[in-house]
């Protein structure tokens, strides 16, 4: 079971894992869901090169709080905080509520699954060999203190006629152990041969 299910959803409320959207709605659920989708797509489009890991949206009675986890927080904040103010205004226009935007820096981006998967996807789009990109990510992760890592690429690898999946795994990865802190992410690389899916599991040792 632990091998198949999404490791983050499987461990919710364990190891401080939480939902990416923290709010409750009754009648206006659809409207708030569309607002969340807009906020995520707008931030991802505006800060493509800021090393975004995750965006957490929390709603209180009269306040919407957005927390952006990034490996390059300075890119998001901008000169004298101008860029983040622009984001705040754009979101406030959409949700018609007071908005708070916080930026959290990631100290070790080499062991963040979302950043690893997006890095591999970017390299594949630049026609770097998929094996080289995967092995480099694995080495960096283990060097920075990751307990174990598994990386998978699926699609027309290297421009092959028949799509296939290749996996690389190093270190420990206890997917059945619920208290083990497992980070997981999925990303897509849009190459000239088609889409290549990249999946990354990282065992973070406390």
Swiss-Prot record:
<dbReference type="InterPro" id="IPR004044">
    <property type="entry name" value="KH_dom_type_2"/>
</dbReference>
<dbReference type="GO" id="GO:0003729">
    <property type="term" value="F:mRNA binding"/>
</dbReference>
<dbReference type="Pfam" id="PF07650">
    <property type="entry name" value="KH_2"/>
</dbReference>
<keyword id="KW-0687">Ribonucleoprotein</keyword>
<comment type="similarity">
    <text>Belongs to the universal ribosomal protein uS3 family.</text>
</comment>
<dbReference type="InterPro" id="IPR036419">
    <property type="entry name" value="Ribosomal_S3_C_sf"/>
</dbReference>
<dbReference type="Pfam" id="PF00189">
    <property type="entry name" value="Ribosomal_S3_C"/>
</dbReference>
<dbReference type="InterPro" id="IPR004087">
    <property type="entry name" value="KH_dom"/>
</dbReference>
<dbReference type="InterPro" id="IPR001351">
    <property type="entry name" value="Ribosomal_uS3_C"/>
</dbReference>
<dbReference type="GO" id="GO:0022627">
    <property type="term" value="C:cytosolic small ribosomal subunit"/>
</dbReference>
<dbReference type="InterPro" id="IPR015946">
    <property type="entry name" value="KH_dom-like_a/b"/>
</dbReference>
<keyword id="KW-0694">RNA-binding</keyword>
<dbReference type="InterPro" id="IPR005704">
    <property type="entry name" value="Ribosomal_uS3_bac-typ"/>
</dbReference>
<keyword id="KW-0699">rRNA-binding</keyword>
<comment type="function">
    <text>Binds the lower part of the 30S subunit head. Binds mRNA in the 70S ribosome, positioning it for translation.</text>
</comment>
<protein>
    <recommendedName>
        <fullName>Small ribosomal subunit protein uS3</fullName>
    </recommendedName>
</protein>
<dbReference type="InterPro" id="IPR018280">
    <property type="entry name" value="Ribosomal_uS3_CS"/>
</dbReference>
<feature type="domain" description="KH type-2">
    <location>
        <begin position="39"/>
        <end position="107"/>
    </location>
</feature>
<dbReference type="GO" id="GO:0019843">
    <property type="term" value="F:rRNA binding"/>
</dbReference>
<keyword id="KW-0689">Ribosomal protein</keyword>
<dbReference type="GO" id="GO:0003735">
    <property type="term" value="F:structural constituent of ribosome"/>
</dbReference>
<comment type="subunit">
    <text>Part of the 30S ribosomal subunit. Forms a tight complex with proteins S10 and S14.</text>
</comment>
<dbReference type="GO" id="GO:0006412">
    <property type="term" value="P:translation"/>
</dbReference>
<dbReference type="InterPro" id="IPR009019">
    <property type="entry name" value="KH_sf_prok-type"/>
</dbReference>
